[in-house]
UniProtKB/Swiss-Prot annotation:
Name assigned to this protein: Protein Smg
InterPro entries given in the database record: Smg
Any matching Pfam family: DUF494
Residues forming coiled coils: none
Superkingdom per UniProt: Bacteria
Family, as annotated: Belongs to the Smg family.
Length: 157
């Protein structure tokens, strides 16, 4: 499922290509590439629920509030997100890339993934995918993209 999400993001979204709204054709195309039907369905369902999640969280939390808070993770969240991942989320909050709202969306969507543990590289992709899909997050998406993809270029001698 996660591989399907990454493929969709790299192929259709990040490359600037038009993504087909026709889920039947998209599903067929992904199957032809070699993805399993089960993984395709889960990935598309995950993206659909991202939309629902955004609406629910943004309607329940005042967007003007962007206080830094200490997030208390549940045992399940701690199991899925190791200390490096939780530290990275805090780091993104401190850089004002994540707000309270986007942090909660990211954690909720991570918990919905059908993987037992998320590593730091997977987390970076998940955050990119989510920020790209949230209206109004274009600036922080670009900031994160520059941080992740241009950081290594700047430190190479």
């Amino acid at each position: 499922m996660f591989e399907v999400l990454i493929y969709l993001f790299e192929t259709y979204v990040h490359s600037g290509s038009e993504i087909s709204i026709d889920y039947k054709n998209l599903t067929s195309d992904l199957s032809d590439i070699g993805f399993r039907s089960k993984d395709i369905y889960k990935a598309l369902h995950w993206l659909k629920n991202l939309s629902c999640c955004k609406k629910n969280i943004f309607s329940s939390i005042n967007l003007s509030l962007n206080h830094t808070t200490n997030r208390i993770y549940t045992k399940k969240e701690e199991f899925k997100l190791n200390s490096d991942c939780r530290g990275f989320i805090l780091f993104l909050e401190e850089l004002e890339i994540l707000t309270l709202n986007t942090r909660e969306i990211i954690i909720e969507r991570i918990m919905a993934l059908d993987i037992s543990h998320v590593n730091i590289e997977d987390l970076k992709w998940i955050v990119l995918i989510i920020l790209f899909n949230i209206p109004g997050c274009e600036v922080v998406y670009r900031k994160l993209e520059n941080l992740l993809f241009n950081f290594k270029k700047e430190i190479v001698h």
